[in-house]
Amino acid sequence: MTLQEMKKKVLGLIEELNPLSEYLTDDPDIQAKINEVTNQIMFELVRFKKMPKYVEIHVNEGDILEFADIEKECGYEIYQIDIICGVRYVPKASGTVLKFMETGTAEISCFVYPERITEKTKDKAYEFELSQDVLEVMPYGIAGDLLKSDVSTEYGAVYSNRYQEMLSRLDHRYQMPTMYIDGGVDV
């Protein structure tokens, strides 16, 4: 889904959509806030249903890697490391720094934030990297936040409540845990 499609969904929900307007709405407050509100909801959702990434980095014994080094390799802002295989390491600084105890290839699975939306972001070009179920929840969170300061109506609370309800039903897993055992002992 593109940013433009998301904006159309949100603005349609809150009855502020004007498809003839360059900004899809005539409301200047919504025009000014929609990108930042979209970021806030997107980042909230991605901490609930994490965005996994995988990267391989060649390391030498004694090398120290920080989040920034891993971010350069994978091209995303990391907020949590999941699993590291392939080489022995010792986590430092609450796991944000890794000291490698041997030479080899570090196979790093981590969780990242999506690309941030700015005023320069092209609505038609920006593609959300979130799962389909998250994209179905997201418009309600955006709508609720856009309307929460509008005290003349209850729309903000209606959309916020719907968002919380949908969020509580969202499954944070991408797959069910599985185990494969190879080999074994003949008795």
Where are these regions (language model features)?
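Glycine-enriched, solvent-exposed interface loops adjoining structured elements
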Residues: 1-187
